[in-house]
Amino acid sequence: MSDFDRVRDYLTALQDRICNVVETIDGQSHFHEDHWQRTEGGGGRTRLLRDGAVFEQAAIGFSDVCGTHLPPSASVRRPELAGANWRACGVSLVFHPKNPFVPTTHLNVRYFRAEREGKQVAAWFGGGFDLTPFYPFDEDVVHWHRVARDLCAPFGDERYAAHKRWCDEYFVLRHRNETRGVGGLFFDDLDKDFERDFDYQRAVGDGFLDAYFPIVTRRHDTPYGDRERAFQLYRRGRYVEFNLLFDRGTLFGLQSGGRAESILISLPPLVRWEYGYHPLPGSAEARLADYLLPRDWLEESRICE
């Protein structure tokens, strides 16, 4: 079996596993699957759960697509590959829970290969996961980062710190001067050793289940009202802004002639903007600002213990 097929098989199995966990936790709605083909080459399967007891919308897609000219968003860090033939596979998800006390989350794990004249000239892994709470709990944020640190540990003492920092630097709304959430892990251009890099991708994909779903279980029954719901929808606007303005995966998909329905499925089903909004000083809504900047969550928790 080729390296690409090994990655592909892992990713399709990961999509299945995550969907099973989501349906079990939600207990009400089920994923609907849409198989699609891309005219330029390849295809995928998009799964969407809507109007659940826990998840307002949970979208998770697998794609295996190819093309003849590497788009600018993929070659900006590798200009020597501009115009090369390419093939990419990946799993990407965004979950928008119903309860404002359950964070939104994102996971992406992908593998990319470039060819010239039928020969592979480059291949690399990328991905990561991040967490976007609206009413954050320190316990949840520390748990999230502990799982991230622990899954990184077999890959060197610097792996967690480096990929956490990369996440903090990537998921930034520069026009708002705030991060998208409390971070996590982000990596790209991982190409030193296929087996080791593939092990890391699997650790990230598998670790996501351990990082996110305990938080969902803890928070999805938390009482909330109209005020919390309105703030959730307002903050979702920031999520939309990042995805449309800065997200590399979104830009790559659109620039490569990808399937817009699948690319934009990450956007929340309901969202609102409000001109000149400022939360009341000292309120739970105002407290969120303290979380939307890079912080060493594990060191802070150690000091507080």
Curated annotation (Swiss-Prot):
Its cofactor is a divalent metal cation. Gene3D superfamilies: Coproporphyrinogen III oxidase, aerobic. A divalent metal cation binds at residues 96, 106, 145, 175. SUPFAM superfamilies: Coproporphyrinogen III oxidase. Its EC number is 1.3.3.3. Pfam families: Coprogen_oxidas (PF01218). It is an enzyme of class 1 (oxidoreductase). Keywords: Cytoplasm, Heme biosynthesis, Metal-binding, Oxidoreductase, Porphyrin biosynthesis. Residues 239-274 are annotated as: Important for dimerization. The active site is at 106 (proton donor). Substrate binds at residues 92, 108-110, 257-259. It catalyses: coproporphyrinogen III + O2 + 2 H(+) = protoporphyrinogen IX + 2 CO2 + 2 H2O. GO terms for biological process: protoporphyrinogen IX biosynthetic process. GO terms for cellular component: cytoplasm. InterPro entries: Coprogen_oxidase_aer, Coprogen_oxidase_aer_sf, Coprogen_oxidase_CS. It is found in: Cytoplasm. Its main location: cytoplasm. Belongs to the aerobic coproporphyrinogen-III oxidase family. Homodimer. Involved in the heme biosynthesis. Catalyzes the aerobic oxidative decarboxylation of propionate groups of rings A and B of coproporphyrinogen-III to yield the vinyl groups in protoporphyrinogen-IX. NCBIfam families: PRK05330.1. This is Oxygen-dependent coproporphyrinogen-III oxidase. It comes from Xylella fastidiosa (strain M12). The gene is hemF.
